Regions:
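Conserved catalytic-core segment of NTP-binding enzymes
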Residues: 1-127
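Structural signal for conserved beta-strand scaffold positions within catalytic alpha/beta enzyme cores
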Residues: 38, 134-136
Length: 168
């Protein structure tokens, strides 16, 4: 899509189409008029795709990149194994061995997902020195007006917290 103006400019050597293509190329190359914000999720393949796309957009097209938006970020749950064990021991619940095993397995799975997520977020930050706007994972099968409002609030706060251009 962003390569189209260059194709039109090269195909139409003169005339209105050529002038308009040149104007579009000037616009998308001007960071005051055009900034691209790419969105990913904190998993290996999507992060790889964002990195590749970012370099292509900047190097090949000269388009300025804005902050990276990372969608569906799981909340950190430090010490989840200990918390589950403590809660199980302190509560009046009479858990079976199978239930304790299931809780331990679930905690291990969640801890592994969080570790992978942190690795990808760290890698993204190391390879692409862009600010990151992180949107929380929404648990559930649908998103309604309430969830959209919550995400909008998080997004607005994150944008307001970004450093001003030149303050970095």
């Amino acid at each position: 899509f962003l390569r189209s103006p260059a194709g039109v400019r090269d195909a139409a050597k003169t005339g209105v189409l050529h002038r308009q293509a040149v104007e579009v190329l000037e616009m998308i190359g001007d960071p005051d008029r055009c900034t691209v914000m790419l969105v990913t999720i904190p998993e290996e393949t999507p992060v790889n795709e964002m990195i590749e796309t970012s370099f292509a957009i900047e190097e090949e097209l000269g388009v300025h990149l804005g902050p990276a938006v990372v969608n569906s970020v799981l909340p950190d749950l430090d010490d989840l194994d200990h918390e589950l064990a403590t809660l199980a021991a302190e509560s009046s619940l009479d858990l079976t061995d199978n239930e304790r095993t299931a809780l331990t397995t679930a905690a291990g799975f969640r801890a592994g997902r969080l570790r992978l997520q942190r690795e990808q977020l760290d890698r993204l930050g190391a390879v692409l020195p862009l600010d990151q706007i992180r949107l929380p994972h929404r648990f559930g099968s649908s998103i309604g007006p309430g969830e959209i409002a919550e995400l909008a609030t998080v997004l607005t706060s994150a944008i307001e917290a970004l450093p001003e251009e030149g303050d970095e």
